[in-house]
C-alpha cells in the first residue's frame, strides 16, 4: 500500500477537518512528498504552493477556478474564439433535458476538477449512470479535502459544452503552460486523458522533450 493512501482515506472521511490549514498541510505534506513541510522558509516548488494555500487570498482565484465564470474573464481579455462554446448551465442534475442536448456533448461541474461526462453518441449513453456521476461530482469540496480556498465560494453548477476533438482523431490534446515569475517555463502536453492508459508527456523550455517523465 502506498504511504499516502491511508492519508487520502482519512482526509475524505473528515478525520482532519478540525485542523487549521497550516496544521493540515504540515500533517499530510510529508505523507505525499516524503519530507517535512517548511512554511517559514519554503524552498521547493511544492512547499511554496502550500504557503500560498495558507496565506494567499484573492477573489480573482474564485473566478479562475469556476469553469463558467472563468470563460467570461478570458473572453473579455482575448476574445470568445479561445473559449469552448457553452451549451447551457444548470443548478441541478434534474434540470438537464437530455432531448435538448446535441448528439455529442460534455458535462462537468463548475466547481470540480477531473469529473466529466463525455457523450460521443446519445444513442449509446447511459443517462442514469451519467446523472449519478454528476451528483457525485456535485458533492466534491476541494476547499475541505484539499484546503484550496479558491473553491470555497464557487457555486455548484453543471456546465454543458460542445464536444471537441482533434481533426481526424477522437482524442484532443491538452496543453498546460506553467509560468514562474510571469514567464512560461514548462509546457505539459496530455493525451488519452480519459483512457485507461492515459499518456502524459512533459516538455521544458524550447520544447525539449523530457522522456524520463513520460507515463
Positions of PLM-derived features:
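Membrane-proximal basic amphipathic "stem/tether" segments
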Residues: 1-56
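Alpha-helix initiation/capping motif
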Residues: 1-6, 15-21, 44, 66, ...
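Residue-level signal for pocket-adjacent positions within structured domains
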Residues: 59, 113, 198-199, 215
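Active-site nucleotide/adenylate-binding loops and adjacent lid/helix of ATP-dependent enzymes
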Residues: 50-57, 61-173, 178-183, 187
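Conserved, surface-exposed functional patches that form binding/active-site neighborhoods
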Residues: 178-206
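Conserved small/polar residues in nucleotide/adenosyl-binding loops
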Residues: 210-214
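Hydrophobic transmembrane signal anchors and adjacent membrane-proximal interface regions, especially
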Residues: 7-11, 76, 209
Amino acid at each position: 500500500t502506498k504511504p499516502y493512501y491511508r492519508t487520502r482515506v482519512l482526509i475524505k472521511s473528515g478525520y482532519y477537518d478540525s485542523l487549521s490549514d497550516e496544521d493540515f498541510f504540515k500533517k499530510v505534506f510529508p505523507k505525499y512528498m516524503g519530507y517535512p513541510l517548511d512554511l517559514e522558509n519554503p524552498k521547493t516548488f511544492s512547499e511554496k504552493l502550500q504557503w500560498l494555500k495558507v496565506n494567499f487570498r484573492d477573489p480573482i482565484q474564485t473566478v479562475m477556478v469556476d469553469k463558467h465564470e472563468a470563460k467570461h474573464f478570458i473572453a473579455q481579455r482575448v476574445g470568445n474564439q479561445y473559449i469552448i462554446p457553452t451549451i447551457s448551465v444548470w443548478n441541478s442534475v434534474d434540470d438537464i433535458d437530455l432531448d435538448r442536448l446535441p448528439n455529442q456533448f460534455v458535462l462537468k461541474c463548475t466547481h470540480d476538477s477531473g469529473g466529466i461526462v463525455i457523450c460521443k453518441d446519445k444513442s449509446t449513453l447511459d443517462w442514469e449512470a451519467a446523472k449519478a456521476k454528476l451528483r457525485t461530482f456535485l458533492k466534491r469540496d476541494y476547499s475541505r479535502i484539499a484546503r484550496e480556498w479558491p473553491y470555497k465560494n464557487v457555486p455548484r453548477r453543471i456546465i454543458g459544452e460542445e464536444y471537441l476533438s482533434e481533426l481526424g482523431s477522437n482524442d484532443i490534446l491538452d496543453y498546460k503552460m506553467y509560468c514562474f515569475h510571469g514567464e512560461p517555463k514548462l509546457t505539459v502536453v496530455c493525451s488519452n486523458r480519459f483512457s485507461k492508459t492515459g499518456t502524459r508527456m512533459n516538455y521544458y523550455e524550447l520544447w525539449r522533450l523530457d522522456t524520463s517523465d513520460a507515463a
